[in-house]
């Protein structure tokens, strides 16, 4: 899968002052935005190629529905992120097991890192194009660790070369608790250090697919 989420900040920098996204009725595409909603940080981006709606709901809830094609990623969480126990529940329904995943997603600086803790994914395994870095057992499952280098790609600091870290759950689930510090420590032990935290969200991500998701972040903002 194209790592379209790395485009997020570059594309939302222009739209960050928009506040809570509203549906563009003419194009049926929710505008890109970042901000705060009911105490939670949220981030939303799509490339505009798929009819898609992202909706911030009460508390830590959000929903997203996409129809076909295009790249999109969004969700609610914290800015900055941290070693945190994240409780979440979701109805995550990619059509026909299509290319999508439900993930904890975030960035750090010094070093500049984009990271994923993937709880569920469709037919495409996002670790398939990365280098394996071992595995850990956590939260009742094996998580396989991967690393890749993104060369001169969009990031939270503009176009940069940076590392991308993955922890991919082998027994998929759509609700539970993720202790992010467990994965930060596992990555560090594998020679993959985490830096100073930027944002961290419980995200829905999709590429050239269709589906819907309703997600509740239960951990307080």
Curated annotation (Swiss-Prot):
Query: What is this enzyme's EC?
Result: 3.2.1.8
Q: Which UniProt keywords apply?
A: Carbohydrate metabolism, Glycoprotein, Glycosidase, Hydrolase, Polysaccharide degradation, Signal, Xylan degradation
What would you give as a GO molecular function for this chain, any one?
Answer: endo-1,4-beta-xylanase activity
* Pfam families from the UniProt entry: Glyco_hydro_11
Residues of this chain annotated as glycosylated in UniProt:
96
What the entry lists under InterPro entries is as follows: ConA-like_dom_sf, GH11/12, GH11_AS_1, GH11_dom, Glyco_hydro_11
The protein's job, in short, is: Endo-1,4-beta-xylanase involved in the hydrolysis of xylan, a major structural heterogeneous polysaccharide found in plant biomass representing the second most abundant polysaccharide in the biosphere, after cellulose. May act as an elicitor of plant defense responses in certain plants but does not exhibit any cell death when transiently expressed in N.benthamiana.
- Give the family from UniProt: Belongs to the glycosyl hydrolase 11 (cellulase G) family.
Q: Report the gene name.
A: EIX4
Q: What Gene3D superfamilies does this protein's entry cite?
A: 2.60.120.180
Q: What is this protein called?
A: Ethylene-inducing xylanase 4
Every copy of the GH11 domain together lies at 28-218
- Signal sequence region: 1-19
**Reaction catalysed by this enzyme:** Endohydrolysis of (1->4)-beta-D-xylosidic linkages in xylans
> Which pathway is recorded for this entry?
Glycan degradation; xylan degradation
Cite the active-site annotation: 114 (nucleophile), 205 (proton donor)
Any single biological process term in GO: xylan catabolic process
Q: Does the keyword Zinc apply?
A: no
């Amino acid at each position: 899968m194209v790592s379209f989420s790395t485009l997020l900040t570059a594309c939302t920098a222009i739209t960050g002052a928009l506040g809570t996204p509203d549906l563009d009725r003419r194009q049926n595409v929710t505008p890109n935005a970042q901000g705060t909603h009911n105490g939670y940080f949220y981030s939303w981006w799509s490339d505009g190629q798929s009819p898609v709606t992202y909706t911030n709901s009460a508390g830590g809830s959000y929903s997203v529905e996409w129809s076909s094609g295009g790249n999109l990623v969004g969700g609610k969480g914290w800015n900055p992120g941290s070693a945190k126990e994240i409780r979440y529940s979701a109805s995550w329904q990619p059509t026909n097991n299509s290319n999508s995943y439900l993930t904890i997603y975030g960035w750090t600086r010094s070093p500049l890192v984009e990271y994923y803790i993937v709880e569920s994914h469709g037919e495409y395994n996002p670790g398939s194009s990365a280098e394996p870095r071992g595995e850990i057992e956590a939260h009742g499952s094996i998580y396989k660790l991967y690393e890749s280098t993104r060369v001169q790609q969009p990031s939270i600091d503009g176009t940069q070369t940076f590392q991308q870290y993955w922890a991919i759950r082998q027994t998929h689930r759509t609700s539970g608790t993720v202790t992010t510090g467990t994965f930060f420590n596992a990555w560090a032990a594998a020679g993959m250090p985490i830096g100073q935290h930027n944002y961290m969200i419980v995200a829905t991500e999709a590429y050239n697919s269709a589906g819907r998701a309703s997600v509740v972040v239960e951990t307080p903002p």
